[in-house]
């Protein structure tokens, strides 16, 4: 029993010396630290300019098409495929956590001519010549309020919610698309490379249901309209600069 007690005392003594030595080293390191050289990025009052490129994922399902008179009707399907685009944005920080981002984008969605041919078959002129594929252009102006979850250090995630108005345009044969507007959700992260330079990864979900109108050269003298559930998801990567 006495032997065990002696061993315990030896262990405690050695442990005490080790802890004291470790604590002294930490204290010395704190004293010697140069905080002026430590990377520390402050958001408050700054402006952030970003440029991004990305891919677009859209469903483009149509709703509200009128009842057709075709005996051998075919499924209309989606009117557009996935696409690509880019945007430029300016972010102003009200404090380290809250910011507002204003962005202007230019996006391209590829039309599915099988859908246009199906509309022509069901409602109007069969075997219509559709010509070359013409895309749908989406030009959104977006204002987003952001909350920066961890605003210090080199990695800064954020979330946001806002509103967009999108100018829609296409030169596709027999198709006209109206402008749209709705809410947009956002999540992203900034990777700071230097004090004023960063890499940005951003995901935005646009909610958008523009109105489609089919022209007489596709459907004859009938009035055929529908709502398309576009709801594009835009995944982007880009660079940014603070001012």
Swiss-Prot record:
Keyword terms: Cell outer membrane, Membrane, Signal, Transmembrane, Transmembrane beta strand
Cystine bridges: none
An annotated GO cellular component: cell outer membrane
InterPro entries assigned: OMP/PagP_b-brl, OMPW
Source organism of this protein record: Rickettsia prowazekii (strain Madrid E)
Organism taxonomic ancestry: Bacteria, Pseudomonadati, Pseudomonadota, Alphaproteobacteria, Rickettsiales
Database matches in Pfam families: OmpW
Cross-referenced Gene3D superfamilies: 2.40.160.20
UniProt GO BP: transmembrane transport
Compartments it resides in: Cell outer membrane
Family: Belongs to the OmpW/AlkL family.
Signal peptide as annotated in the record: 1-23
Protein name (record): Putative outer membrane protein RP075
């Amino acid at each position: 029993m006495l032997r065990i007690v002696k061993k315990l005392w030896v262990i405690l003594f050695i442990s005490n010396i080790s802890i004291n030595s470790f604590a002294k080293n930490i204290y010395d390191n704190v004293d010697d630290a140069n905080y002026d050289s430590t990377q520390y990025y402050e958001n408050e009052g700054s402006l952030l300019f970003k440029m991004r490129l990305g891919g677009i994922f859209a469903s483009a399902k149509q709703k509200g098409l009128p009842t057709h008179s075709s005996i051998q009707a075919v499924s209309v399907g989606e009117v557009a495929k996935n696409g690509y685009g880019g945007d430029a944005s300016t972010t102003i920080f009200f404090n380290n956590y809250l910011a507002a981002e204003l962005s202007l984008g230019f996006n391209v969605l590829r039309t599915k001519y099988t859908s246009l041919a199906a509309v022509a078959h069901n409602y109007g002129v069969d075997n219509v010549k559709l010509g070359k594929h013409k895309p749908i252009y989406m030009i959104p102006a977006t204002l987003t309020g952001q909350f920066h979850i961890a605003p210090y250090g080199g990695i800064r995630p954020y979330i946001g919610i806002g509103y967009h108005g999108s100018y829609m345009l296409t030169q596709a044969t027999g198709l006209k698309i109206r402008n749209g507007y709705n809410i947009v959700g956002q999540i992203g992260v900034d990777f700071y490379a230097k004090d004023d330079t960063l890499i940005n990864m951003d995901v935005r979900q646009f909610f958008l249901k523009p109105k489609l109108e089919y022209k007489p050269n596709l459907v004859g003298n009938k009035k055929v309209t529908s709502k398309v559930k576009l709801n594009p998801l835009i995944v982007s990567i880009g660079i940014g600069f603070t001012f």
